[in-house]
């Protein structure tokens, strides 16, 4: 099984708000999905994957099974995890103030590459801290 990157991002076209696109030029087909929520877009993406596998089976073409590593842009991440992580909490984790995070969510401001890297690094550090905790 091969693991490929999949980009989850916000789009502002028509009724769909989120897009999920496979970022794997080495794979002989492309995949994408769209939806009003990240979950809908992921489900649409996985449906497309099932459909392409069915087509390849019908045409007797071989393919490698894929697993997916989802990568989020900051607005999509903030929206997807908003029910778990508050902006106040994310400010403490990332050092980016709530107002700026809110601008990212609303699309009124776009983070610089250095901000994205810092946000990702701080978030992963927080996740590592959580993984090292044992509750007794």
Q: Which sequence ranges carry the predicted segments?
A:
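Short, charged, surface-exposed hinge/linker loops at domain edges
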Residues: 1-5, 47-116, 129-135
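DNA-contacting interfaces and partner/effector-binding or oligomerization modules
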Residues: 1-58
């Amino acid at each position: 099984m091969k693991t490929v990157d999949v980009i989850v991002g916000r789009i502002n076209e028509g009724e769909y708000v989120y897009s999920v696109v496979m970022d794997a030029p080495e794979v002989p087909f492309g995949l994408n999905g769209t939806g009003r929520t990240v979950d809908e877009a992921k489900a649409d993406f996985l449906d497309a994957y099932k459909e392409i596998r069915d087509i390849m089976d019908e045409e007797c073409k071989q393919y490698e099974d894929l697993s997916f590593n989802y990568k989020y842009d900051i607005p999509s991440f903030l929206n997807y995890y908003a029910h778990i992580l508050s902006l106040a909490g994310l400010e403490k984790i990332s050092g980016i103030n709530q107002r700026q995070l809110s601008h990212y969510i609303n699309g009124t401001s776009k983070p610089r590459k250095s901000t994205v890297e810092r946000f990702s690094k701080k978030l992963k550090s927080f996740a590592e801290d959580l993984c090292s905790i044992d509750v007794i």
